[in-house]
A protein has these predicted regions:
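A ligand-binding cleft/hinge motif common to bilobed small-molecule-binding domains
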Residues: 98-104, 223-224, 228-246
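Early extracytoplasmic/lumenal segment of secretory-pathway proteins
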Residues: 28-102
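Periplasmic-binding protein-like
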Residues: 119-122, 136, 199-205, 244-268
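Extracytoplasmic ligand-binding site segments that recognize negatively charged/polar headgroups
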Residues: 41-52, 89-226
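Short, low-complexity disordered leader/linker segments with a strong preference
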Residues: 1-38, 349-350
Length: 350
């Protein structure tokens, strides 16, 4: 009986080898992805490298499909998604925490599909407004050789020893949008009724040595002491710590570090929905999420991922995830244009 059973298995395997590559897609349906072309809009650099190694190359080899990565920032691909809603040139798009939720609400992106096999492994915050790919904590990075009194709270940025030494990013950006809200919360101001007072408080930081858009430039200025502290993400900061820069990242209190989430959405009218969902499901896997953590220090959305203590120290991990502050991005985006004018005045008066 065992010989006959083995013979049946061998026959089945031989037949399978002569048939097109057919796989069980993320939604549970059998799919043939051979020669399909999936277009994914995503950031470049280390993110591209991790995705190619852990998702793109394995899928292309296994399924016989082709996956094109269109590199760039979120503003360009978001604009294309809205303009091309009826015939999207990109099937999958990586966006930030507020862009993805808005795209779903506006009907240009699909809502999440809970049937994906890795969906239930995501933290709750990663299951809404798009598929959560990674999270970061927005906090403070500072030169710990020049700043001898440790920074522990957001209000510490207003200390006399840091006056005129705090850098902000160019506006608009996630960092600056969030910093407006955080300034209000830290100083007990009502952002909705005391907006001018909030910007007056930001101006009290003194002359700004740098409005950064280039991280290499920022950390060089920090090394030289022109900048002593900056509003920054944990993952980027820890990358420069690894490179030997004399800096330290902290999750400041009052009210806490800000939750930043990179998300994935699928275009509403994609012609490759099953392949797109398979791509997303692979991105959410333990293997890919582990690579995000270990290779580029992006914190995890899959709660089943385990990393060593050294890696964990560089991430928002475990109980720290619950401590991140979520902001009212709907309100922030509604007022971003007027905030831009106020930021420009800060720069002009710099």
């Amino acid at each position: 009986m065992r010989k006959r059973f083995f013979g049946l298995l061998l026959t089945a395997a031989m037949v399978a080898c002569t048939m097109p590559m057919t796989v069980m897609a993320a939604d549970g349906d059998s799919q043939d992805f051979k020669d399909e072309n999936l277009v994914v809009g995503v950031w470049g650099g280390t993110i591209e490298e991790v995705l190619r190694k852990n998702v793109v190359d394995p899928m292309e080899e296994e399924y016989g499909c082709n996956i094109d990565l269109v590199l760039g920032g979120t503003s360009e691909r978001k604009a294309k998604m809205y303009a091309e809603v009826d015939n999207p040139s990109m099937d999958v798009l990586f966006l930030n925490i507020y862009e993805s939720a808005q795209a779903i609400a506006d009907g240009v992106a699909q809502d999440v599909d809970p049937s994906l096999s890795n969906f239930d492994s995501l933290y709750d915050f990663a299951q809404t407004g798009g598929y959560g790919m990674s999270i970061m904590g927005l906090g403070i990075v500072y030169n710990d050789e020049l700043v001898t009194d440790p920074i522990t709270s957001w209000k510490d940025l207003w200390r006399d020893d840091l006056k005129g030494k705090v850098a902000l990013s160019t506006f608009p950006s996630f960092e600056d949008d969030a910093f407006v809200d955080i300034t209000a919360q830290a100083w007990g101001l009502d952002l909705k009724t005391q907006e001018d007072e909030v910007f007056d408080k930001i101006a009290e930081l003194g002359s700004f040595p740098l409005f950064y858009s280039d991280l290499d430039e920022l950390f060089l200025e920090m090394k030289q002491g022109t900048v002593k502290a900056a509003v920054m993400f944990n993952s980027y900061s820890n990358d420069y710590v690894e490179q030997g820069f004399p800096v330290k990242f902290v999750y400041p209190s009052d009210p806490g570090a800000v939750l930043a989430k990179d998300t994935i959405v699928i275009a509403k009218n994609t012609k490759h929905e099953a392949l797109a969902k398979e791509f997303v499901n692979r991105c959410l896997s333990v293997e890919t999420q582990t690579a995000y953590a270990e290779d580029i220090y992006f914190s995890l959305c899959n709660k089943n991922v385990k990393v060593d203590d050294e890696t964990a120290s560089k991430l928002v991990y475990g109980d720290d995830v619950d401590s991140l502050v979520s902001l009212d991005w709907t309100y922030i985006l509604e007022h971003e244009s007027e905030w831009t004018d106020k930021y420009n005045k800060l720069i002009e008066g710099n």
